[in-house]
Amino acid sequence: MKLTINILFCLILISQYNSANGNLRDLFNNVRGSISSSANKIRQDVKTLFHPSDKSGNKESSNIVFVEDKDEGAVGPARDNKPVAVTPAPVVSTTTQASAPTVATNGTATGGKDDKGRENFNGGCLAGYMRTADGRCKPTF
């Protein structure tokens, strides 16, 4: 860290130093001038790219002529004017037979015994469990 600060300080002192011939100062001025000129050239290129002027000599854009097509002399692909035979689609009947509704009956009889709603339980047991006769899930060993 101290070394880089010392090097920068020395470079600043050297750049300000005027030698007898001015070679060192001319070197830095030449580098700075070339960087400045290339930056100006890039700036001009970008400016002309996004904001083109009419003085740039782009005369092709002003000489655009639109020609309308005429159907009289146009040559296109030959086409037959024969009618195409169309077959009608078959008609499908959509009538349905109505049936009398039936009364749904539960297959299990309660028989006076209180099952607490287990007669309607149709769920399965988890893996590793087995259904008992009264509808509970019991672990298998």
Swiss-Prot record:
Gene Ontology terms: cellular component: extracellular space
Pfam families reported for this sequence: GBP_PSP
Gene: PSP1
Propiece residue ranges: 23-118
InterPro entries: GBP_PSP
Taxonomy, superkingdom: Eukaryota
Disulfide bond residue pairs: C125-C137
Amino acid composition bias (Polar residues), ranges on this chain: 99-108
Name used for this protein in its record: Plasmatocyte-spreading peptide
Entry keywords, A to Z: Cytokine, Disulfide bond, Signal
Chain segments carrying region Disordered: 46-118
Role description: Mediates the spreading of plasmatocytes to foreign surfaces. Plasmocytes are a class of hemocytes involved in insect cellular immunity.
Biased composition annotated in UniProt, kind: Low complexity: 83-98
First and last residue of the signal peptide: 1-22
Ranges of biased composition (kind: Basic and acidic residues): 46-58
Organism: Chrysodeixis includens (Soybean looper)
GO MF annotation terms: cytokine activity
Family: Belongs to the GBP/PSP1/paralytic peptide family.
